[in-house]
């Protein structure tokens, strides 16, 4: 059996670059997997309750289930020696709670926090639709106001995705949680 892998969580507001950075980071590591938290949401074809500014109890329960599944999946891959890169929007008190869900002893958290103007520009350039009920600016406000200041907060506004990955790898010790 291989040595246990690390779990690296990448979060930030919509349009912060999480998917691109997580993909590039995963490709840089020799034995790794990219876990898209959003995938678990999309698996629900009937009965899905999406998050809104005033979420229903079902939406909150489904969000917690999504976070549970992402953490369990990351831990399972980690047990088999994979570095598991978990990428999702995790805001407010949910961030500290999510980190506690991960059992892997080597846990890291990177919060991509580009400027609001960079987020808005990136959102305009995107082909994919993010959260229909929430803007990147609204998510960024919650991130900055309510997220626990844990992990490595990275203003990647002036970085290319490749530079952001280099920054993360060079500062991974600062991301330990």
Language-model region placement:
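Conserved phosphate-donor/acceptor-positioning beta-strand/loop module used by diverse small-molecule
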Residues: 88, 103-123, 154
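Glycine-rich phosphate-binding loop used to anchor ATP phosphates in small-molecule kinases
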Residues: 61-104
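Conserved substrate/cofactor phosphate-moiety recognition/catalytic segment
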Residues: 23-69
